[in-house]
């Protein structure tokens, strides 16, 4: 079998096809503190800026080779769409997901 690229490896795995090796990815959020540090971003701020979201999501692939770039920033989209305000915990240095 030829070596697959990251995209094909993940898609073939989901299709139940043979892959050259198991893909290393998470279907859930995978933003890391190392990625945020490298970008100079705070986790809370990433929830409010599309470019920061994309950069944070891509950082895990760029730094660690994970075969995905998942933006875990949609957790409150339904509530926001209905007019609710979210709390991104801007005061915290921890990785706290909005509520």
Describe every region a protein language model picked out.
Residues 1-99:
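Catalytic cores of TIM-barrel enzymes
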């Amino acid at each position: 079998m030829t070596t697959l690229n990251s995209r094909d490896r993940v898609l073939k795995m989901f299709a139940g096809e043979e892959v050259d090796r198991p893909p290393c990815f998470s279907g859930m959020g995978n933003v890391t503190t190392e990625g945020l540090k490298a970008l100079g971003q705070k986790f809370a701020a990433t929830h409010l800026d599309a470019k920061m979201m994309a950069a944070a999501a891509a950082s895990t692939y760029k730094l660690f080779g994970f075969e995905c770039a998942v933006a875990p920033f949609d957790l409150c989209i339904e509530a926001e769409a209905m007019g609710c305000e979210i709390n991104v915990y801007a005061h915290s240095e921890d990785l706290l997901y909005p509520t």
